[in-house]
Structures are given as C-alpha cells and as structure tokens.
C-alpha cells in the first residue's frame, strides 16, 4: 500500500480509503446491509493496508455507521483513522451537535472520531452553523 502525508498532520494516509456510502445489501432496502460481507470487506481492506475509513450519519439510513462500528471491533479500530459527518441539514439548535455526536459515537462503538466533517455544508447551511457556533462546539469536543 502506498501512503501519503495527510495535509499538515503527522498522519500518513493510505492511497486508498474505504468509503461506506454504498455497501452490499441483502435485500431492496437501503438499510438492509449484508453485515457479514461488509465486515469482511472492511477488515480485508484494513489488513491490506487501508488506514482511512469514511462513513456518515445518513448513509444507508444510519446503518452504515453501525456496521462500520462492528467491523472495527476486535482491534481494527486502533489501526485506522475514522471519519464521519455531522448532517448539517439536521442541525437546528446548538444542542443538536452534541446529540448527533453522541449518537454517532454510540453507533460507531468508539470513544472518538478522528475526522468529524460537516456534511453537505453549503450556502444554505453555513450561516446556520456559524450562527449556532457549531465550529466552536466542535473545537470544545476535541478536548
């Protein structure tokens, strides 16, 4: 696996990451993820050197985070950097940040998220994020 510097951090990110937006399904429903196959896929990628896994609150109706959390059990979590995303369109009040973050930590079965991204941040949602102080809230969550 090839690795590259991740911005100005000390982290060397694998040239390939694992994105969990479209996972194998058992049936027609978007949240009906084939969990055993997905866990095998994620762990195979990590065993091959992938060290960046990306998911989001809304992927597969929220089930992507759950299955990613399952895949990262048994020692896999410490081998990767985990990214997920705050659904900016669902943030209506300042406390929504804490509620969403806690829910995502629970789904992912982890105590921390390495990269917490603002999902679908655009001209519509940016003013609300700014007015609610979401960036400051995120900085406080780092501590």
List each language-model region with its residue ranges.
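Conserved beta-strand positions
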Residues: 18, 55, 84, 115-118
């Amino acid at each position: 696996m090839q690795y590259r510097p991740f911005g100005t951090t000390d982290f060397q990110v694998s040239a390939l990451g694992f994105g969990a937006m479209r996972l194998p399904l058992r049936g027609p429903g978007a949240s009906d993820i084939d969990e055993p196959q997905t866990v095998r896929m994620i762990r195979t990628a990590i065993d091959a050197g992938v060290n960046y896994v990306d998911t989001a609150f809304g992927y597969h109706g929220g089930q992507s985070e759950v299955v990613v959390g399952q895949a990262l059990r048994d020692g896999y979590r410490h081998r990767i950097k985990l990214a997920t995303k705050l659904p900016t369109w669902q943030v209506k009040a300042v406390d929504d940040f804490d509620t969403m973050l806690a829910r995502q930590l629970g789904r992912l079965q982890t105590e921390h998220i390495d990269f917490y991204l603002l999902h679908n941040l655009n001209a519509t949602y940016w003013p609300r994020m700014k007015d609610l102080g979401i960036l400051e809230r995120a900085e406080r969550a780092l501590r």
